[in-house]
A protein has these predicted regions:
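RNA-contacting regions in translation and RNA-metabolism proteins
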Residues: 1-50, 60-63, 67-97
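The feature captures the beta-strand-to-loop junction immediately N-terminal to the Walker
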Residues: 54
């Protein structure tokens, strides 16, 4: 199976002013979703960079998803990518506690 995190980073890092602030993480899924061939990833970055990664009307985000899903077809996987700022990610982590 391909290293999807590496593919996502290769697509996203050139778009960022500060690539070291990028977080790409595979999200945990339940067993049924794994059997259904779905992979879920989170891309988190500073709020100032998020607009650049999503693009106007989501065109950049859609392009990133398309590129990653082309590789996913080789492995018979569907790849879902969610974009968030660090602020949104921190709020969700605090809500879980």
């Amino acid at each position: 199976m391909a290293d999807y995190e590496k593919i996502i980073r290769a697509c996203v890092e050139p778009l960022m002013e500060n690539p070291s602030s990028l977080l790409v993480r595979r999200e945990e899924t339940d067993e049924e979703a794994e059997k259904a061939r779905d992979l879920h990833f989170l891309i988190a970055c500073p709020d100032a960079e998020l607009g650049r990664l999503i693009g106007r009307h989501g065109t950049v985000a859609d392009a990133i998803r398309t590129i990653v899903n082309v590789k996913g077809r080789d492995d018979r996987k569907r790849v879902h990518i969610r974009f968030e700022s660090f602020e949104e990610e921190n709020e969700k982590e605090e809500d879980k506690k």
